[in-house]
Amino acid sequence: MARVTTGITSSHIPALGAAIQTGTSDNDYWGPVFKGYQPIRDWIKQPGNMPDVVILVYNDHASAFDMNIIPTFAIGCAETFKPADEGWGPRPVPDVKGHPDLAWHIAQSLILDEFDMTIMNQMDVDHGCTVPLSMIFGEPEEWPCKVIPFPVNVVTYPPPSGKRCFALGDSIRAAVESFPEDLNVHVWGTGGMSHQLQGPRAGLINKEFDLNFIDKLISDPEELSKMPHIQYLRESGSEGVELVMWLIMRGALPEKVRDLYTFYHIPASNTALGAMILQPEETAGTPLEPRKVMSGHSLAQA
């Protein structure tokens, strides 16, 4: 049967994609960010770590959806998803190849589990989906695995609650485990961490909130899932609510997990950046060395 072997989190800051495209990923500003991702890139190439399929949880930024249609949860069931034109032409990255059989199976299972999914048989994917792929897989001619895009509305109020997202992750795991094909499946939760793009608090970053969120995501995700929207807004900025998508990833893993790697960097553009590798405790691999990396212009200690 298929199984969820790994959960990965990653910010999806669009400037990361621009740094790759402009050849500035190794300069003084961006170099530490890409250095922090290198252990994940190396890890995923090791035998047994490369997924057959990634369920990639992200939010669309007015590319596939706009104010005319705002699905709370959607799932891409197509064969192929093209990079979206976000105003400067599509990112020069490979098309995303889907896994329709698994995607339809998950959609059916989730709907029968009382999650009202929007099924997308045609959809372009923006930086929310493609930047994490670039940060972890680099610049291949083709992405090395199939990807099921899983958009979540965190742009237009009301977004789903953390509790609902955590429960959705659990249902995703059950759906995957009932699929008969032998597949290594990852669930990636993207977005965040603390940031605010507009208004009087534009540029807000809250390191204390972010690091506490990381710790709770590992040790007590159920309690973390009870955090109300207003707390995300107050403490992590208007865009910090993207972190509910990390709870979908965490819900797809069992209660006890092992954190293989955690990277935190501030600032990346105007955002706090986080990336993690989590695996079920019973089947987890060896943690990376170092296990936790912190960097950035605003962090005195590495």
Curated annotation (Swiss-Prot):
The keyword Cell cycle does not apply. One of its GO terms (biological process) is catabolic process. Coiled coil: none annotated. GO terms for molecular function: ferrous iron binding; protocatechuate 4,5-dioxygenase activity. Responsible for the aromatic ring fission of protocatechuate. Its EC number is 1.13.11.8. It catalyses: 3,4-dihydroxybenzoate + O2 = 4-carboxy-2-hydroxy-cis,cis-muconate 6-semialdehyde + H(+). The lineage of its organism: Bacteria, Pseudomonadati, Pseudomonadota, Alphaproteobacteria, Sphingomonadales. The keyword Oxidoreductase applies. Composed of two subunits (alpha and beta) in a 1:1 ratio. This is Protocatechuate 4,5-dioxygenase beta chain. Its cofactor is Fe(2+). It comes from Sphingobium sp. (strain NBRC 103272 / SYK-6). Transmembrane segments: none annotated. InterPro entries: PCA_45_Dioxygenase_B, Xdiol_dOase_suB. Keywords: Aromatic hydrocarbons catabolism, Dioxygenase, Iron, Oxidoreductase. Pfam families: LigB.
